[in-house]
Amino acid sequence: MEVIHLGAEHSLLNRFVMEMRDVTIQNDRLRFRRNIERVGEVMAYEISKKMTQQVRTVTTPLGEAECSVPQDKVVLATILRAGLPFHHGFLNYFDYCENAFVSAYRKYKDRLNFDIHIEYIASPDITDKVLIISDPMLATGSSMELAYKALLTKGNPKHIHIASIIASQQAVDYIRGVMPDNTTIWIAAIDPTIDEHSYIVPGLGDAGDLAYGEKL
Protein backbone atom coordinates (compact mmCIF):
# COMPACT_ATOMS: atom_id res chain seq x y z
CA MET A 1 0.00 0.00 0.00
CA GLU A 2 1.25 3.44 -0.91
CA VAL A 3 0.37 6.80 0.67
CA ILE A 4 1.00 9.74 -1.68
CA HIS A 5 1.08 13.16 0.00
CA LEU A 6 0.65 15.53 -2.93
CA GLY A 7 0.87 18.64 -0.77
CA ALA A 8 4.48 17.82 0.02
CA GLU A 9 5.36 18.43 -3.63
CA HIS A 10 4.77 22.21 -3.22
CA SER A 11 2.60 22.72 -6.29
CA LEU A 12 -0.33 25.02 -7.12
CA LEU A 13 -2.50 22.41 -5.39
CA ASN A 14 -1.50 23.95 -2.06
CA ARG A 15 -3.05 27.29 -3.03
CA PHE A 16 -6.42 25.62 -3.57
CA VAL A 17 -6.15 23.96 -0.15
CA MET A 18 -5.06 27.25 1.46
CA GLU A 19 -8.12 29.05 0.10
CA MET A 20 -10.40 26.28 1.37
CA ARG A 21 -8.89 26.58 4.85
CA ASP A 22 -8.97 30.40 5.03
CA VAL A 23 -11.86 31.40 7.30
CA THR A 24 -12.70 34.41 5.10
CA ILE A 25 -12.23 32.99 1.61
CA GLN A 26 -14.12 29.76 2.39
CA ASN A 27 -17.33 31.73 2.97
CA ASP A 28 -17.65 32.14 -0.79
CA ARG A 29 -19.47 28.86 -1.49
CA LEU A 30 -18.96 28.99 -5.24
CA ARG A 31 -15.22 29.46 -4.81
CA PHE A 32 -15.08 26.79 -2.11
CA ARG A 33 -16.80 24.23 -4.33
CA ARG A 34 -14.60 25.19 -7.27
CA ASN A 35 -11.43 24.73 -5.21
CA ILE A 36 -12.59 21.26 -4.17
CA GLU A 37 -13.27 20.52 -7.83
CA ARG A 38 -9.80 21.77 -8.79
CA VAL A 39 -8.14 19.44 -6.30
CA GLY A 40 -10.17 16.59 -7.80
CA GLU A 41 -8.86 17.50 -11.24
CA VAL A 42 -5.25 17.54 -10.03
CA MET A 43 -5.66 14.18 -8.31
CA ALA A 44 -7.36 12.65 -11.34
CA TYR A 45 -4.36 13.64 -13.44
CA GLU A 46 -1.91 12.19 -10.91
CA ILE A 47 -3.87 8.94 -10.49
CA SER A 48 -4.01 8.45 -14.26
CA LYS A 49 -0.21 8.09 -14.26
CA LYS A 50 -0.56 4.90 -12.19
CA MET A 51 -2.91 3.18 -14.63
CA THR A 52 -2.16 0.56 -17.25
CA GLN A 53 -1.36 2.29 -20.53
CA GLN A 54 -2.23 1.25 -24.06
CA VAL A 55 -0.65 2.59 -27.25
CA ARG A 56 -3.27 3.61 -29.80
CA THR A 57 -2.68 4.75 -33.34
CA VAL A 58 -4.83 7.62 -34.54
CA THR A 59 -5.14 9.27 -37.91
CA THR A 60 -4.46 13.00 -38.05
CA PRO A 61 -5.02 15.33 -41.04
CA LEU A 62 -1.31 14.88 -41.87
CA GLY A 63 -0.60 11.26 -41.05
CA GLU A 64 -0.68 8.86 -38.10
CA ALA A 65 0.38 9.30 -34.47
CA GLU A 66 0.87 6.85 -31.63
CA CYS A 67 -0.70 7.89 -28.32
CA SER A 68 -0.27 6.21 -24.94
CA VAL A 69 -3.57 6.34 -23.02
CA PRO A 70 -4.97 4.66 -19.88
CA GLN A 71 -6.80 1.45 -20.70
CA ASP A 72 -8.20 0.49 -17.28
CA LYS A 73 -11.94 0.53 -16.75
CA VAL A 74 -12.58 3.08 -14.01
CA VAL A 75 -15.43 3.58 -11.55
CA LEU A 76 -15.57 6.93 -9.75
CA ALA A 77 -17.24 6.69 -6.35
CA THR A 78 -17.93 9.38 -3.78
CA ILE A 79 -19.57 9.81 -0.39
CA LEU A 80 -22.52 12.21 -0.34
CA ARG A 81 -22.87 15.18 0.11
CA ALA A 82 -19.48 16.86 0.63
CA GLY A 83 -17.96 14.57 -1.99
CA LEU A 84 -20.02 15.95 -4.90
CA PRO A 85 -17.74 18.81 -6.04
CA PHE A 86 -14.70 16.58 -5.49
CA HIS A 87 -16.35 13.91 -7.64
CA HIS A 88 -17.07 16.47 -10.36
CA GLY A 89 -13.38 17.33 -10.48
CA PHE A 90 -12.50 13.70 -11.12
CA LEU A 91 -15.31 13.39 -13.65
CA ASN A 92 -13.98 16.38 -15.61
CA TYR A 93 -10.91 14.28 -16.41
CA PHE A 94 -12.31 10.73 -16.30
CA ASP A 95 -15.33 11.79 -18.33
CA TYR A 96 -15.72 8.35 -19.92
CA CYS A 97 -16.00 6.47 -16.61
CA GLU A 98 -18.83 4.89 -14.67
CA ASN A 99 -19.98 6.40 -11.39
CA ALA A 100 -21.01 5.21 -7.94
CA PHE A 101 -22.52 7.06 -4.98
CA VAL A 102 -22.71 6.17 -1.29
CA SER A 103 -24.69 8.01 1.37
CA ALA A 104 -23.02 7.97 4.79
CA TYR A 105 -24.03 10.04 7.80
CA ARG A 106 -23.33 10.41 11.49
CA LYS A 107 -26.13 9.16 13.76
CA TYR A 108 -25.49 10.78 17.12
CA LYS A 109 -26.11 8.97 20.41
CA ASP A 110 -25.34 12.16 22.33
CA ARG A 111 -23.36 15.38 21.76
CA LEU A 112 -20.03 13.60 21.26
CA ASN A 113 -20.75 9.98 20.37
CA PHE A 114 -22.06 8.73 17.05
CA ASP A 115 -22.14 5.79 14.66
CA ILE A 116 -21.63 5.98 10.90
CA HIS A 117 -24.62 4.70 8.91
CA ILE A 118 -24.71 3.78 5.23
CA GLU A 119 -28.20 4.48 3.91
CA TYR A 120 -27.90 4.41 0.12
CA ILE A 121 -25.64 2.99 -2.57
CA ALA A 122 -25.87 3.23 -6.35
CA SER A 123 -23.06 1.54 -8.23
CA PRO A 124 -22.27 -0.43 -11.38
CA ASP A 125 -20.37 -3.71 -11.29
CA ILE A 126 -16.83 -2.90 -10.09
CA THR A 127 -15.30 -6.33 -10.76
CA ASP A 128 -11.72 -6.04 -12.10
CA LYS A 129 -12.06 -2.28 -12.49
CA VAL A 130 -10.05 0.55 -10.95
CA LEU A 131 -12.15 2.01 -8.13
CA ILE A 132 -11.51 5.62 -7.10
CA ILE A 133 -13.31 6.61 -3.88
CA SER A 134 -13.24 10.33 -3.14
CA ASP A 135 -14.16 12.12 0.07
CA PRO A 136 -12.71 15.57 0.79
CA MET A 137 -12.26 15.05 4.54
CA LEU A 138 -10.83 11.90 6.10
CA ALA A 139 -11.23 12.44 9.85
CA THR A 140 -11.35 8.95 11.38
CA GLY A 141 -11.49 6.77 8.27
CA SER A 142 -14.65 4.99 9.40
CA SER A 143 -16.92 6.43 6.69
CA MET A 144 -14.41 5.50 4.01
CA GLU A 145 -14.09 1.95 5.33
CA LEU A 146 -17.87 1.45 5.44
CA ALA A 147 -18.31 2.97 1.98
CA TYR A 148 -15.69 0.60 0.59
CA LYS A 149 -17.37 -2.41 2.22
CA ALA A 150 -20.72 -1.33 0.77
CA LEU A 151 -19.18 -1.05 -2.70
CA LEU A 152 -17.74 -4.56 -2.37
CA THR A 153 -21.31 -5.85 -2.72
CA LYS A 154 -20.93 -4.80 -6.38
CA GLY A 155 -17.76 -6.81 -7.04
CA ASN A 156 -14.04 -6.94 -6.31
CA PRO A 157 -11.99 -4.14 -7.90
CA LYS A 158 -8.60 -4.54 -9.55
CA HIS A 159 -7.17 -1.61 -7.60
CA ILE A 160 -8.52 0.95 -5.13
CA HIS A 161 -7.52 4.61 -4.96
CA ILE A 162 -8.62 6.51 -1.84
CA ALA A 163 -8.60 10.26 -2.54
CA SER A 164 -8.99 12.93 0.12
CA ILE A 165 -8.10 16.61 0.39
CA ILE A 166 -7.38 16.81 4.12
CA ALA A 167 -6.84 13.78 6.34
CA SER A 168 -5.87 13.37 9.97
CA GLN A 169 -2.80 11.27 10.65
CA GLN A 170 -5.07 8.97 12.67
CA ALA A 171 -7.29 8.36 9.63
CA VAL A 172 -4.34 7.64 7.36
CA ASP A 173 -3.02 5.09 9.85
CA TYR A 174 -6.49 3.56 10.23
CA ILE A 175 -7.08 3.23 6.48
CA ARG A 176 -3.67 1.62 6.06
CA GLY A 177 -4.75 -0.98 8.60
CA VAL A 178 -8.17 -1.88 7.18
CA MET A 179 -7.78 -1.59 3.40
CA PRO A 180 -6.25 -4.30 1.19
CA ASP A 181 -2.71 -4.10 -0.19
CA ASN A 182 -3.95 -3.11 -3.66
CA THR A 183 -4.88 0.34 -2.34
CA THR A 184 -3.23 3.70 -2.95
CA ILE A 185 -4.07 6.64 -0.68
CA TRP A 186 -3.89 10.16 -2.14
CA ILE A 187 -3.86 13.13 0.24
CA ALA A 188 -3.40 16.86 -0.38
CA ALA A 189 -2.73 17.69 3.29
CA ILE A 190 -2.23 15.62 6.45
CA ASP A 191 -3.20 17.30 9.74
CA PRO A 192 -2.01 16.12 13.16
CA THR A 193 -5.20 15.36 15.05
CA ILE A 194 -9.00 15.45 15.46
CA ASP A 195 -11.05 17.13 18.19
CA GLU A 196 -13.66 15.66 20.54
CA HIS A 197 -16.29 15.97 17.80
CA SER A 198 -14.06 14.05 15.34
CA TYR A 199 -13.35 17.12 13.23
CA ILE A 200 -9.87 17.46 11.75
CA VAL A 201 -7.65 20.05 13.46
CA PRO A 202 -6.74 22.53 12.04
CA GLY A 203 -8.75 21.20 9.06
CA LEU A 204 -11.19 23.61 7.46
CA GLY A 205 -14.51 23.03 9.22
CA ASP A 206 -17.51 21.13 7.82
CA ALA A 207 -16.89 20.73 4.08
CA GLY A 208 -20.50 19.84 3.34
CA ASP A 209 -21.87 22.90 5.12
CA LEU A 210 -19.29 25.18 3.50
CA ALA A 211 -20.16 23.85 0.04
CA TYR A 212 -23.95 23.66 0.33
CA GLY A 213 -25.11 25.42 3.50
CA GLU A 214 -25.77 24.29 7.05
CA LYS A 215 -28.00 21.28 7.66
CA LEU A 216 -30.57 20.85 10.42
Swiss-Prot record:
Enzyme Commission identifier(s): 2.4.2.9
InterPro entries named in the record: PRibTrfase_dom, PRTase-like
Entry cofactors: Mg(2+)
Record-listed 5-phospho-alpha-D-ribose 1-diphosphate binding positions: R81, R106, D135, P136, M137, L138, A139, T140, G141, S142, S143, D206
Textual note on the cofactor: Binds 1 Mg(2+) ion per subunit. The magnesium is bound as Mg-PRPP.
Inhibition and activation profile: Allosterically activated by GTP.
Pfam families cross-referenced by the UniProt entry: UPRTase
Functional note: Catalyzes the conversion of uracil and 5-phospho-alpha-D-ribose 1-diphosphate (PRPP) to UMP and diphosphate.
Functional pathway: Pyrimidine metabolism; UMP biosynthesis via salvage pathway; UMP from uracil: step 1/1
Species of origin: Porphyromonas gingivalis (strain ATCC BAA-308 / W83)
Keywords: Allosteric enzyme, Glycosyltransferase, GTP-binding, Magnesium, Nucleotide-binding, Transferase
Residues that coordinate or bind uracil: I200, G205, D206, A207
Major enzyme class: transferase
GO biological process: UMP salvage
Source species, domain of life: Bacteria
Gene Ontology MF: a single term: GTP binding
Protein name per the record: Uracil phosphoribosyltransferase
Family to which the UniProt record says this protein belongs: Belongs to the UPRTase family.
